[in-house]
């Protein structure tokens, strides 16, 4: 239980920050799912277009340190590889 004024304020801030970070993580997962769905659709050009938008979202969230930069890089790498495999 937060006893000091500072601790109470930090507890309030933590609730707000948690909600904001959760929303950003959700946006990241949604972007990855959108690319996966486009890949499953079979249209390489459409998948590449969706991937380009997802890349921006992934990088932005990694820059804010919501997810680790290596996790973001891994996600982009796997999606890119999946798109490249479509042509083969």
Swiss-Prot record:
Keywords recorded for this protein, A-Z: Ribonucleoprotein, Ribosomal protein, RNA-binding, rRNA-binding
Protein family (similarity comment): Belongs to the bacterial ribosomal protein bS20 family.
The species this protein was found in: Ralstonia nicotianae (strain ATCC BAA-1114 / GMI1000) (Ralstonia solanacearum)
Region (Disordered): 1-20
Protein's gene: rpsT
One cellular-component annotation, GO: cytosol
GO biological process terms held by the UniProt record: translation
GO terms, molecular function: small ribosomal subunit rRNA binding; structural constituent of ribosome
HAMAP family membership: Ribosomal_bS20
Name of the protein: Small ribosomal subunit protein bS20
Phylogenetic classification of the source organism: Bacteria, Pseudomonadati, Pseudomonadota, Betaproteobacteria, Burkholderiales
Function noted in UniProt: Binds directly to 16S ribosomal RNA.
Keyword Transmembrane: no
InterPro entries named in the record: Ribosomal_bS20, Ribosomal_bS20_sf
Iron-sulfur listed as a keyword: no
């Amino acid at each position: 239980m937060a006893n000091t004024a500072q601790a109470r304020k930090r507890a309030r801030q933590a609730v707000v920050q948690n909600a904001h970070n959760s929303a950003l993580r959700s946006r990241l997962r949604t972007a990855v799912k959108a690319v996966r769905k486009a890949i499953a659709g079979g249209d390489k050009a459409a998948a590449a277009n969706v991937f380009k938008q997802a890349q921006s979202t992934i990088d932005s969230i990694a820059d804010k340190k919501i997810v680790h930069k290596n996790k973001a890089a891994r996600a982009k790498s796997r999606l890119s590889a999946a798109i490249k495999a479509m042509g083969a």
